Swiss-Prot record:
Organism per entry: Halobacterium salinarum (strain ATCC 700922 / JCM 11081 / NRC-1) (Halobacterium halobium)
Enzyme nomenclature, EC number: 1.15.1.1
Family: Belongs to the iron/manganese superoxide dismutase family.
Source species, domain of life: Archaea
Lineage, uppermost ranks: Archaea, Methanobacteriati, Methanobacteriota, Stenosarchaea group, Halobacteria
UniProt-recorded name of the protein: Superoxide dismutase [Mn] 2
Function: Destroys superoxide anion radicals which are normally produced within the cells and which are toxic to biological systems.
Annotated Gene Ontology cellular component terms: cytoplasm
Cofactors (names): Mn(2+)
Cofactor mode of binding and number, as noted: Binds 1 Mn(2+) ion per subunit.
InterPro entries from the UniProt entry: Fe/Mn_Superoxide_Dismutase (IPR050265), Mn/Fe_SOD (IPR001189), Mn/Fe_SOD_BS (IPR019833), Mn/Fe_SOD_C (IPR019832), Mn/Fe_SOD_N (IPR019831), Mn/Fe_SOD_N_sf (IPR036324), SOD_C_sf (IPR036314), Superox_dis_Halo (IPR054865)
PROSITE patterns in the record: SOD_MN (PS00088)
């Protein structure tokens, strides 16, 4: 069984300042994200041991831990990749066209996404729904409650308090605005291209 590892950041810890502080990035990546990696590895080890011994007394808890920590790990990995010190602006190309087609305009999409970010107690996601073949905004509680089965995340924004409270206090809206100052549309567009190639 392979061990999951904490990925390195694609930029320096202070690279997103003044929008997101070095302290928050350090805590968030090195402590919070690491805890999900550790929790996922531990849960998978428990499941492997239980399958070997046939004793499943701890299996239910481990299954829940895989879901919680796995989603936390995977979404955080996307979150780091979706920011850059050279970010900001709006999407272009095929992704921009699809956002306009599915939401009416970029402005409509962003307004709805910001509502999702304000409503969620976990994550705001832009996902591709392969059943309806359209983009959707999703408000996810924790890491794994409220997700749309079968959908593929294109963009991930962490709105847990540990993402912003040190920098912005209870003003989550200012943190969301700050995220859009550092958003990197290139990997998001690549995610979109990859998933559309599978279903359209």
């Amino acid at each position: 069984m392979s061990q999951h590892e904490l990925p390195s950041l694609p930029y320096d810890y202070d690279a997103l300042e003044p929008h997101i502080s070095e302290q928050v990035v350090t805590w968030h990546h090195d402590t919070h994200h690491q805890s999900y990696v550790d929790g996922l590895n531990s849960a998978e080890e428990t499941l492997a041991e239980n399958r070997e011994t046939g004793d499943h007394a701890s299996t239910a808890g481990a299954l829940g831990d895989v879901t919680h920590n796995g989603c936390g790990h995977y979404l955080h990995t996307m979150f780091w990749e979706h920011m850059s010190p050279d970010g900001g602006g709006e999407p272009s190309g095929a992704l921009a066209d699809r956002i306009a087609a599915d939401f009416g305009s970029y402005e409509n999409w962003r307004a709805e996404f910001e509502v999702a970010a304000g409503a969620a107690s976990g994550w705001a996601l832009l996902v591709y729904d392969p059943v309806a073949k359209q983009l959707r905004n999703v408000a996810v509680d924790n890491h794994d409650e409220g997700a749309l089965w079968g959908s593929h995340p294109i963009l991930a924004l962490d709105v847990w308090e540990h993402s912003y409270y040190y920098d912005y206090g209870p003003d989550r809206g200012s943190f969301v605005d700050a995220f859009f100052e550092v958003i990197d549309w290139d990997p998001i567009a690549a995610n979109y291209d990859d998933v559309v190639s599978l279903f359209e």
